[in-house]
C-alpha cells in the first residue's frame, strides 16, 4: 500500500473565522499556523500548501500574559551600525494589532516560498467585522 501524497490541484480549501478577543496571542497564533499549514487534515503533505483560509477578528483585543506588554519588544534593524529599533508590544498592539498577530503567525510557519503562500491565506482584522461573508466561513472554536 502506498502513502497518499496530496497534489496542489486536489486540495479543497475551507474558510474559518477565529475570534481572538481575550485569548493569549501565542496560543491563538499556533493553532492558526497549524490550520494554515493543513496539519488538521488527514491528507497533510509537508511539501504542498494544503491549508485552509483563516480570518482572525478582534485582533486588537488579543491578550499577552504576564509583563509581556512592556517587556516583549518588536525588533527591527536597518542593517546600518546602531540601526536597531525596539518597540514594546504595548505600542505595537495600540497602533497595528493586525501586524503583531501576522508576525506571530509568520514566525511559526515554514521559512521560504511555501510559508509565504500560506501567509497569504491569513486575513486579520482589528474589529469584529470582516469582508469575507461571501465565502461562508465556519466559526472555529480553539482548543485553548
UniProtKB/Swiss-Prot annotation:
Superkingdom as given in the UniProt entry: Bacteria
One GO cellular component term noted in the UniProt record for this chain: cytosolic large ribosomal subunit
Keywords (A to Z) from UniProt: Ribonucleoprotein, Ribosomal protein
Coiled-coil ranges (or none): none
InterPro entries: Ribosomal_uL13, Ribosomal_uL13_bac-type, Ribosomal_uL13_CS, Ribosomal_uL13_sf
Pfam families in alphabetical order: Ribosomal_L13
Cited CDD domains: Ribosomal_L13
Family annotation (PROSITE patterns): RIBOSOMAL_L13
MF-aspect GO terms: mRNA binding; structural constituent of ribosome
GO BP term (any one): negative regulation of translation
NCBIfam families cross-referenced by the UniProt entry: rplM_bact (TIGR01066)
Role, per record: This protein is one of the early assembly proteins of the 50S ribosomal subunit, although it is not seen to bind rRNA by itself. It is important during the early stages of 50S assembly.
UniProt subunit comment: Part of the 50S ribosomal subunit.
UniProt similarity note: Belongs to the universal ribosomal protein uL13 family.
Protein name per the record: Large ribosomal subunit protein uL13
Source organism: Clostridium botulinum (strain Eklund 17B / Type B)
Amino acid at each position: 500500500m502506498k502513502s497518499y501524497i496530496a497534489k496542489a490541484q486536489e486540495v479543497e480549501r475551507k474558510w474559518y473565522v477565529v475570534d481572538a478577543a481575550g485569548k493569549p496571542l501565542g496560543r491563538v497564533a499556533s493553532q492558526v499556523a497549524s490550520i494554515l499549514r493543513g496539519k488538521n487534515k488527514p491528507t497533510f503533505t509537508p511539501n504542498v500548501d494544503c491549508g485552509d483560509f483563516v480570518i482572525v477578528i478582534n485582533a486588537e483585543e488579543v491578550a499577552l500574559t504576564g509583563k509581556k506588554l512592556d517587556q516583549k519588544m518588536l525588533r527591527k534593524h536597518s542593517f546600518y551600525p546602531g540601526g536597531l529599533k525596539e518597540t514594546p508590544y504595548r505600542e505595537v498592539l495600540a497602533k497595528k494589532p493586525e501586524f503583531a498577530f501576522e508576525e506571530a503567525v509568520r514566525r511559526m510557519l515554514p521559512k521560504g516560498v511555501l510559508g509565504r503562500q500560506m501567509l497569504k491565506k491569513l486575513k486579520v482584522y482589528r474589529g469584529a467585522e470582516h469582508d469575507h461573508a461571501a465565502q461562508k466561513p465556519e466559526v472555529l472554536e480553539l482548543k485553548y
